[in-house]
């Protein structure tokens, strides 16, 4: 695809890591094989500069970001400081539960919070959106949307209160 020619993607799906572990996880995802904690950040920076010089952007996506410790969030903030004279070398994208907002409101994370340029919260899905969401997930899984009746899909939506993560969990167990 087209996005791969413009972006180097780093994906951390389950970031229950301290600051140093996070540095090494990012390095591994970037293809950096080094276990020297004193060199790892400079090796990451060198890699990011090389990627930037080719015209590509590096994007670090962290899922379940509410699980990040304050130390790991500070490590991410420092990654966000890596830049050339004109450009940031890495974009950070955090996905998390509402607890992430609570964590980011902590006083010691104010510097991190000040660097957030865009924030978005998802509202619960309407019943029609919930049914369409379930249909889409089933289609993507190759199961077709006929596994559950419309009444069952609405019951799943109701039990999940329209929250996509809960819809996924309930559907998976059903």
What are these regions (language model features)?
Residues 17-21, 33-75, 84-88, 125-130, ...:
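Mid-core helix/loop region of P-loop NTP-binding domains shared across ATPases and GTPases
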Residues 4-9, 17-35:
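Conserved NTP-binding/hydrolysis module of P-loop NTPases
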Residues 64, 94-99:
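A short beta-strand-to-loop transition that corresponds to the Sensor-1 phosphate-sensing loop
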Residues 2, 21-29, 43, 71, ...:
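Alpha-helical scaffold elements adjacent to nucleotide-binding pockets in ATP/GTP-utilizing enzyme cores
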Residues 61, 96, 121:
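Conserved Rossmann-like nucleotide-binding pocket used by diverse enzymes
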